[in-house]
Amino acid sequence: MITFISKFLASKSLTLNSQKSYLYDLQQFAEIIGEEVTPNKLKLYEQSLADLKVSAKKRKISAVNQFLFFLYENEVLDRFYKIKNKEKLPLLTPAYQEVDLSVLYRKIGDSKGQLIALLIVELGLSPSEIIQLKWENIALEFQVLTIVNEKVMRILEIPQLLLPYLEGEHKAVYLFDNKGEAYSRQWLFQKLNYYLASVDLSQMTAQKLREQYIIKEKNKGTAILDLTRKLGLKSPVTLEKYFKN
């Protein structure tokens, strides 16, 4: 059997490291099988792999099956034996997953911090867009709001879940109005962070909440180009990592 292992390796174009790996796996196989391949001996070999990790088991079985086919092809064996790997590699956990944010929809005292969080999670708005949002750009009766900046105008549908939180706000010039002026980004981050801490989500940030919006939209089946437009991005490049899984 050792002689045939050498011939098998010589027939393949392998790197030195791959050759060593094949040789090691096949020598172990030969120690258990001996000079004669039988179904019972193959079962013994399978049992010897029981405690190995799935990836290691898969590698060894692949090497042995290639070797068994080589033996059959060269008429060393009168039939082709094949070991079936019944185990599969565990599925990789997606890198980006939805987080349970149901707590954001519960009624609490800090309505402004809550609304900021919901505007990010439900519409994917950035902090800069939120502090510049005016009531004249919000049409509750049509369930739409308009985001206006120097380069582009976006019309976004207001989700039904978000409507009650907007309807309860006092209408002035800005959605978050500071005597007719917009608040600073620092004010927004302070309100948001205070609110998130109060609902035990201090690990979240404006960026992570926006990421949750992206993940949720992707899981709903929104195409990457449609999501690019919804977010007002110039290109889908920054979204590609979320669509790889």
Swiss-Prot record:
GO terms for cellular component: cytoplasm. Keywords: Cytoplasm, DNA integration, DNA recombination, DNA-binding. It is found in: Cytoplasm. InterPro entries: CB (IPR044068), DNA_brk_join_enz (IPR011010), Integrase-like_cat_sf (IPR013762), Integrase_catalytic (IPR002104), Integrase_recombinase_N (IPR010998), Tyrosine_recombinase_XerD-like (IPR020876). Residues 1-72 form the Core-binding (CB) domain. GO terms for molecular function: DNA binding; tyrosine-based site-specific recombinase activity. Signal peptide: none annotated. The keyword DNA-binding applies. Residues 90-245 form the Tyr recombinase domain. GO terms for biological process: DNA transposition. The active site is at K151, R210, Y242 (o-(3'-phospho-dna)-tyrosine intermediate). It comes from the Bacteria. The keyword Cytoplasm applies. Its main location: cytoplasm. Putative tyrosine recombinase. Not involved in the cutting and rejoining of the recombining DNA molecules on dif(SL) site. Belongs to the 'phage' integrase family. XerD-like subfamily. This is Tyrosine recombinase XerD-like. It comes from Streptococcus mutans serotype c (strain ATCC 700610 / UA159). The lineage of its organism: Bacteria, Bacillati, Bacillota, Bacilli, Lactobacillales.
